[in-house]
Amino acid sequence: MPFVNVKLIEGVFTPDQKQQIIRDLTEAMVAIEGENLRPVTWVVVEEVHSGHWGVAGNPLSTADVKALAAGAPVG
């Protein structure tokens, strides 16, 4: 029974985007393990509070991730 746990910084993805993540990861697992495992393929999306995620020794905020996605340097 596949269990996929995705951690994201809160406020970066919309509810629709999170649903798409769940659908796409389920499809990826089914493609690998077979259709019979679809009913028992679990995908959990956990959101981590802004600033509670560290990269290179520094906290990363929702604003930082959105800036990165827009192509701006963070630092």
Language-model segments: residues:
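A domain-level signal for the structural core that forms small-molecule/cofactor-binding pockets
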Residues: 2-75
